[in-house]
């Protein structure tokens, strides 16, 4: 697919369907991968899901409070990371007028503020090396909105704005891009009933949900030398649900 041999990548949100797929695809292309996840209880499963001899590192700390520690501790994969993919995200859905402050705050904290803190830290390492790939996984919801998800949509739209703004400022061969998935097969979509899934399919011209691997392929492209001249962009992986 895209040659990444010898590259070092840090993937947050690796316990989720998309983050996990990104870790596997980057590793399959030769990258040394560091994982961050808050719910990675089955670590043995992760070791077995990657190829024998994996150089995958286990990095599990609360992302919203330990960003400086995560990067600055003596973890070679972090200090030498050439690619950085943020996928950590949560939802706390509710009607806007009834949304409680804590539900707004926690979604913005995990989805947007933690990404800001960690990117600020890891970019310092990239600037010193004059090389880096920052890939923020946002959502189609950040571009078109979604009823009952004011907090989530705001956080994902914020990621896009953050990436564009940082790209305007960043130099030294550092690219900053977003990948915006639509409906992707995951534990979350598995909970939808048949009627809910039918309603979703009507809005997707390809008439199916995407896979984590399809999102991961876009991330692998942006992490590779093939995308060296691509920056400040958002790649939409949504089956035509939103043609932006």
Swiss-Prot record:
Superkingdom of the organism of origin: Bacteria
Check the record and name the InterPro entries matching this protein: NAD(P)-bd_dom_sf, Sc_DH/Rdtase_CS, SDR, SDR_fam
Q: Which GO terms describe its molecular function?
A: oxidoreductase activity
Annotated active site residues, numbered on this chain, are 152 (proton acceptor)
GO terms classed as biological process? lipid metabolic process; monocarboxylic acid metabolic process
Protease recorded as keyword: no
Which Gene3D superfamilies does the UniProt record give?
Answer: NAD(P)-binding Rossmann-like Domain
List UniProt keywords, sorted A-Z: NAD, Nodulation, Oxidoreductase, Plasmid
Record's protein name: Nodulation protein G
């Amino acid at each position: 697919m895209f040659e990444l041999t010898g590259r070092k990548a840090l993937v947050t949100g690796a316990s989720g369907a998309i983050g996990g797929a990104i870790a596997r695809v980057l590793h399959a292309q030769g990258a040394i991968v560091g994982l961050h996840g808050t719910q990675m209880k089955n670590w043995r499963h992760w070791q077995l899901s990657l190829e024998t001899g994996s150089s995958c590192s286990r990095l599990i700390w609360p992302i919203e409070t330990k960003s400086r520690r995560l990067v600055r501790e003596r973890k070679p994969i972090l200090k030498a990371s050439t690619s950085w993919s943020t996928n950590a995200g949560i939802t706390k859905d509710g009607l806007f007028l009834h949304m409680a402050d804590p539900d707004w705050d926690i979604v913005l904290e995990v989805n947007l503020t933690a990404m800001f803190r960690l990117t600020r830290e890891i970019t310092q390492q990239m600037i010193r090396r004059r090389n880096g790939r920052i890939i923020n996984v946002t959502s189609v919801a950040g571009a078109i909105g979604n009823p009952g998800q004011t907090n989530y949509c705001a956080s994902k739209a914020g990621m896009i704005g953050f990436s564009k703004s940082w790209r305007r400022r960043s130099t030294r061969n550092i690219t900053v891009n977003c990948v915006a998935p639509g409906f992707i097969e995951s534990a979350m979509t598995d909970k939808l009933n048949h009627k809910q899934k039918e309603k979703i399919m009507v809005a997707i011209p390809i008439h199916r949900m995407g896979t984590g691997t399809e999102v991961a392929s876009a991330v692998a492209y942006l992490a590779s030398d093939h995308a060296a001249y691509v920056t400040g962009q958002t790649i939409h992986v949504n089956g035509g649900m939103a043609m932006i």
